[in-house]
Amino acid sequence: MKIYVDADACPVKDVIIFEATNAEIPVTLVTSFSHYSNAEQPKGVETIYVDSGADAADYRIMQLAKKEDLIVTQDYGLASLALAKGCIVLHHKGYKYTNDNIEQLLQTRYLSAMVRKSGKRTKGPKPFTAEDKEKFRALFKSMIAL
């Protein structure tokens, strides 16, 4: 198993790196050049930089990921593609994407886009909380222990 992180706006990178390095599982952070950092990463953690274009990180993750790799993303489109490839996919708020829930998530995203396109406003996501982080940590640890 390898772990790939859609890292541009991922609030749980520290959890992923800590837990994965303790379990000696390699982590690849995929992020755009606009988030460049020369901070040193722990052994087993690699950062891949991609252009800032729409979905560039998603495309790179899909090139790299293999069946049964673990992907962390908040992007429903990437989650859908990764599920079809046989990957394990987690959201940073502590839930697992599945073939059972991805259709509903994609449909909700589409309907919200249509509402916004018509000039109306939609609610954004709820703020990320410490409880969300701990929920993610518990789920992540259970997934890498398999």
Curated annotation (Swiss-Prot):
Domain of life where this protein originates: Bacteria
InterPro entries (alphabetical): UPF0178
Which Pfam families does this one have? DUF188 (PF02639)
Q: Give the family this protein belongs to, as stated in its UniProt record.
A: Belongs to the UPF0178 family.
Q: What is this protein called?
A: UPF0178 protein BC_3040
